Amino acid sequence: RQRIQTFIPTALYLGLFSLMSLFGLGLISAGYDPKFAIEAPVLPWVGILSPWLMFAAFFFLIAANVPGWTRYRVQHPMTLGISLWALTHLAVNPDLHAWLMFGCFFVLVVASALTASGRQKNNPKPAPRWIFDGLTLGLASGLTFCVYTFHGALFGVELS
């Protein structure tokens, strides 16, 4: 990664990395086939709580990128958000594809959390402001609504 960043600017590297990640997520979604069901335990109460768990996941994902108090107080909000997202999906999906995809996301985010101290950047954090926490609440609410409304169109899996 550092070798690549000597040839191209950091912003371009991050943009290309993000595009490749989105492309990979699109390929995962396109390759989904519901006929590969396994006998995995489904926790019905998680289905009832899933809108709230996903709201929390979106909140922490957004909070990781804005200078609010959540980012200031929670050590790794993005790790927490991805963990909530992956575990919620694991708890409600009994098919092999979901277990492989969300299980891998969870394993990778746990590995990232365990190795995070070695990658700590010494960039000063901007002063936290409450306005960004309010903005995060609004964005997470809107994103939760949109994902729940359009989940079938976006990801090919209808929510029951």
Features from the language model and the residues they span:
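Membrane-anchoring alpha-helices and their flanking helix-loop junctions
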Residues: 1-75, 80-160
